[in-house]
Amino acid sequence: MRPRIAHVALYSQLITRPTGRTLRTNILRQIADLDHAVMAVINFRHVPLIDVSCADEIVAELVEWVSEVSPHPRFVWFRGVAEHHLEPIERVLKNRDLVAAAENTDGEPLLMGRYEPVVAQAWREICDMGRAGVPAIAERIPMSLDDTSSLLNAMESLSLLIRDADEYVSLKCAFQDTEVSYPLTPDGQ
């Protein structure tokens, strides 16, 4: 399965709850009713500041949205996450017991929020490989095939991975393999 990519680049200081709510609402308005799998890619590369209230409204709310039951899979991937973004983002995700897939400013994969060490280990392995089946991941973790399958299914339900037939695909790999289908605008225009 290849999701359609909806990409938005943010270019301002994100410092109030109403700003965050407006931005999230505009993003969701543009992709919520799509009748296929979609991955929202939110680029923080040009965001000099994000406070806790905006992190809560944008990051945590979008992560919760992708976790809701939907007829079509939904994913969110945060790119360009810098050190100064991490404290507010980590705080809100941990407070809500959420986890999100991201990429730092150097293009390295990054998990944010609350997760078990085995989730981070499996996630890093899939990010390194791009895509892999259960046996390949089980060998690298190492875990039994059944335990690895259960773990990867749980990670898919958290929208950390995309399932494509018998393989699991990192969000970065899916993004690189798919052209941007829907360039989003922060103002919804």
Where would I find each of the regions flagged by the language model?
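N-terminal, leucine/charged-rich tether regions that mediate assembly and partner docking
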Residues: M1-Q13
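Amphipathic alpha-helical interaction surfaces in cytosolic regulatory modules
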Residues: Y11-M39, F44-L98
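Short helix-capping/hinge SLiMs at alpha-helix to coil transitions
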Residues: D33-H36, I126-G130
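Short acidic, hydrophobic short linear motifs in intrinsically disordered regions
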Residues: V41, D128-I141
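Short amphipathic alpha-helical interaction segments
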Residues: V52, P142-L158
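Short alpha-helical segments that sit at the start of domains
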Residues: K94-C127, D147-S150
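Short, cationic-aromatic polyanion-contact patches
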Residues: R163-Q189
